[in-house]
Amino acid sequence: MLIPSKLSRPVRLQNTVIRDRLLVKLSGVANYRLTLINCPAGYGKTTLIAQWAADQSDLGWYSLDESDNQPERFATYLVAAIQLATGGHCSKSEAISQKHQYASLSALFAQLFIELSEWDGPLYLVIDDYHLITNDAIHEAMRFFLRHQPENLTLIMLSRTLPPLGIANLRVRDQLLELGMQQLAFNHQEAQQFFDCRLSVPLEQGDSSRLCDEVEGWATALQLIALSSRQPNSSAQKSAKRLAGLNASHLSDYLVDEVLDQVDSDARAFLLRCSVLRSMNDALIVRLTGEDNGQQRLEELERQGLFIHRMDDSGEWFCFHPLFATFLRQRCQWEMALELPELHHAAAEGWMALGYPAEAIHHALAAGDVGMLRDILLQHAWTLFNHSELALLEQCLVALPYSLLVQNPELALLQAWLAQSQHRYGEVNTLLERAESAMQERKIPIDEILRAEFDALRAQVAINAGKPEEAEKLATDALKYLPMANFYSRIVATSVTGEVHHCKGELSRALPMMQQTEQMARRHEAYHYALWALLQQSEILIAQGFLQAAYETQDKAFDLIHEQHLEQLPMHEFLLRIRSQVLWSWSRLDEAEEAARKGIEILVNYQPQQQLQCLAMLAKCSLARGDLDNANMYIQRCEALQHGSQYHLDWITNADKPRVIHWQMTGDKAAAANWLRQAEKPGMADNHFLQGQWRNIARIQIMLGRFNEAEVVLDELNENARRLRLTSDLNRNLLLSNILYWQTERKSEAQKALIESLSLANRTGFISHFVIEGEVMAQQLRQLIQLNALPELEQHRAQRILKDINQHHRHKFAHFDEIFVDKLLTHPQVPELIRTSPLTQREWQVLGLIYSGYSNDQIAGELEVAATTIKTHIRNLYQKLGVAHRQDAVQQAQRLLQMMGYV
């Protein structure tokens, strides 16, 4: 829950001086990105802006305290202030901030600005006491805020110090309105008005001006003069003499003499006890003082001018002026040191009763009351955990003695889950083992349910570490003993069980487990696990060959992300990536590329290494289009990320796929052979991850002419794929088997493998997997179509594949580009005619298109030149090749390709 007083604009106090000269300056606030009120304590910063804000409608106010240095807390309150200002216009940003579902503060602000782009009219956000922020992450985010905020949004910042936000840059660009100490200091007229409102005996104008000059217009000093002059044997002049030359750091003695010592003992005790609260209401005052009339006492202090003011329109919440609050806390520590822990204990109880556990924790920590801290955690820790209050929980667990932690095993479990959630995976088992050992030493019983909770977490750690056998045993044991009430651990154990089946290739068992995980996670609002379960379901369906069902499952995942505002989580990139994979398989290349690019956008706030698989997808899109240069650029980026980084084998496999295809297309056997020597060769191929790695190996073996080795690999892959019903892998494997048989002159077996692959594609929808095989595939498909050897569906798919090969590849890309031509002209067997009369680059392109079966008009359209120009090119290249007819040119091109090892 958010404390209302932190989001309420201060009520305009009675008897305050209206600062007309400053309000005139503030009338132009909307013309600036930032209005900065920067001066020491006690000059009326908050009062001035409260006066100005009284006439503003669309304004949010955020009053900071020391606890706001936590980025998550800062973000939640800032967005809440905007929500109050806009009447709930930014609901998505609010949900994201409350659930901490954002990659960084800057990413959250970017989402906020998207929603505010649809807001019409001026909008204002006041952040009071920004000097309390010392967290660099917040400063960096606010620099982003100032650079990108909408034109109609003005930030008003109140601070005792100059905030490190690039203020100079705003000043140069005339985007800063700045008011400092000189402007806020009271002038003679304002000082006269001030004393007229507060003194029973008016001061002469000359006396008032003199007092103002002696304290240099410092509003707090003027207030203290007025307060002191009410005391017997005191005068405004005597107070001014004492205050002259003082500043906020030297006020303690004066405040003791002129304020605390002048009130009765009950009022003094009341003030000191209340000082432990950062904000207060009647219920909290009753807890701390035992007085039933807390609200009346606060109102009476306000009337006396004792530096207390209302924080909201309802008058329920009060706070002390920051200067006075600091002074009172110091005096409380001095005068009530023995009572202070008891006061914080009472404050914690008060906040707990109001439903604010985070504030209660602040006081429990201040009291050093580990027993109370433990009780708060036992009651609220998992709620805080599920709201991602990880930093606060860590602070609490550090404060608890370890003996107290192990006496409450659920807190030891929480400590381990905290490490898991903060990606400190290596610490989780160590923490659990230490806790179990300590409990055994102290003879603290570990019942079956607690053991099952530990096992569920250990199972998650094991599957993350690539230990499926260990994970399966732990998850199975956990599910035996976990009651339905322990839903979170049951969700974890069920998810791990499904993932283990997935890794073992037991897809028919994995899918229902992941569907069950999704249902439980949705029921208990564990939406991260619901999304993970949908992603796993999609991957399982892809492996089974049901790509359309996978696509529809992905739609459900996109809906969940939208409904629960999960757009900034890395799992969103995972979803976009597997969507890209499906679209690529179907040769919807533009959409596949768009999905991969969106995935990279999601990861902009994370480590660049996480972009590896999306970059690999972009490389595959370029390869399917026949754009080798672009593909190579993405491949180089992938290689740069892989250099010096540690990746899971699945990631390496996916990154290597475009590399091996690129080497095949360009004939780079040296790079291929070097890769093969270093490539990891898994012991099994029982799932689609491992099948993919062995397929990469087999492709390189075929390219290097190591046909026997490749055949052994492919036979085992196909056997496993059939046994485990890995339909998509079987579809891909058969295409490689086809290439192997074709290159070893086993045309009948090649045809059989191709026909089965086309048949499987009726289920998978594969197109691009055929297209990337290029001319070898095109030749075979032409033959099958001419022989009319295919059923209707397969015939239609073959024609579509052939069309894509002709459209995207054009066979200039691998065979007739500049690299190929350079290699050809230096080949010892190149025909002398070509060596002495080489074709131009354009003529090589035309030859490639002729070889691909393009007509003259199609070639003209492809190269965007006139048909007569194409005829000239054809005539020239016929002459240079020594041929007279198109078929002769095709045969000559075929011989050149064979000579270079491409066909």
Swiss-Prot record:
GO biological process, one term: positive regulation of carbohydrate metabolic process
Residue ranges of every copy of the HTH luxR-type domain listed in the record: 832-897
Alphabetical keyword list: Activator, ATP-binding, Carbohydrate metabolism, DNA-binding, Nucleotide-binding, Transcription, Transcription regulation
Chain residues that bind ATP: 39-46
Pfam families: GerE (PF00196), TPR_MalT (PF17874)
Tree of life domain: Bacteria
SMART domains in the cross-refs: HTH_LUXR
GO function term, MF aspect, one: DNA binding
Quaternary data: Monomer in solution. Oligomerizes to an active state in the presence of the positive effectors ATP and maltotriose.
Cross-referenced HAMAP family: HTH_type_MalT
Protein name: HTH-type transcriptional regulator MalT
UniProt organism field: Yersinia enterocolitica serotype O:8 / biotype 1B (strain NCTC 13174 / 8081)
Lineage: Bacteria, Pseudomonadati, Pseudomonadota, Gammaproteobacteria, Enterobacterales
